[in-house]
């Protein structure tokens, strides 16, 4: 029997499943798209010149839907960030997901960039479930989000659950989710599994947990930046009955499924930023509903192979035309400036220098994970700056002593959340030393920084509140606020005819030198 079904706004035909027959199911998935709408230069690859793009990914998804029966599409969170997401309060991201035909998503930490109330309003307007089984209003058992859902297509019923882990929670500005309690996931997941198991053919868990992803354009090619999926393996082992787990937050790409040795759960994740589409095809036994065969991979989104989907392009063009002010050029650079996650970087140095110049503070700091895009060579538009630092945050001036500064830098050198980018200091470190004892020397203008020295520092409010695990920042006293980070940077560009690439060398790793000497 042939029946019609809806997917991404177009009506397709698919063959229904006869009871007792083996079933083929294709699960497509994304994570950490983070409003990465356009293809980028694939300078780390030798098989394609460009990679990614939402419109190009949509074409790939539509092609797979035409070729394969019973296709489902999921996302594991972090759909918001960037200029257009900010200007629309996240509305554009959801509209694109509707056009692409998503069946369900989990909540990511970026969904709270505009506060819990804005996100609640947006998620309640979309036709697919936005899931967070461990989200509750503080001091109550009242859920903030739907825990799970059943998606049925052609007689195949999939139970989908969403959760967020504690590392992802710590990446949210605390005041933005103050009324919410994000609880440990295992109990919430098991509760949903128990409710779903007898009602569905397959259970899919969408997670947003593990270590924070490294914010670097070519992260997939740098072995130092590869994250593990231990948190997902552990959760899949702690909860009985999960067939498939699609993860997010760590951008820990899995070229093929990882199988939990105790439960058999298939675990996958992409590298994020819409550079790859996750693919997992399953064969289910028609009688037992057990997975008898699987084939999983990550498909690079090659723009030369998959052209842009017209509906997505039209939506992007319409929204961009609504905000012509962000396309205004505010300055130019002498060369492209790149981000690095665990190294001193051009973009990080520039922002820290800007904070010092604009505030008059002694020292400038910015967390490497906040820098979301490289700055192009030549003309720089407002949208480029908003996409580089997409958060609604102020530059805060604080009074800190030398001990607090040193502890912040030791925390940075664990690389748990990337390297803290700085201005006004000279730092030498040795990664072979134990954590929190890696600083070899810390000076300002050639003078050693002592524990009781007093400094004014300028940094984003996220750090000021202790975000990214920096406990010494909230200990210090706030003495000023010079405005939004993006506005401070825009004014700097407007005030300089050509913005030069800052000199490197303010943070020096002597580990390699020691190894050579030995």
Question: What function would you assign to each model-found segment?
Answer:
Residues 355, 401, 457:
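Hydrophobic, well-ordered secondary-structure elements that form the walls
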Residues 297-301, 332-337, 365-378, 423-433, ...:
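A glycine-rich phosphate-binding loop feature that marks nucleotide/adenosyl-phosphate handling sites
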Residues 5-311, 318-321, 342-354, 364, ...:
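Acidic, metal/ion-coordinating pockets
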Residues 417-444:
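Charge-dense polyanion-binding interfaces
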Residues 378-419:
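C-terminal catalytic subdomain
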Residues 465-518:
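Glycine- and small-hydrophobic-enriched helix-loop-helix hairpins
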Residues 440-463, 483-484:
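Low-complexity, glycine/alanine/valine/leucine- and proline-rich hydrophobic stretches
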Residues 324-346:
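Glycine-rich phosphate/diphosphate-binding loops and the adjacent beta-loop-alpha structural elements
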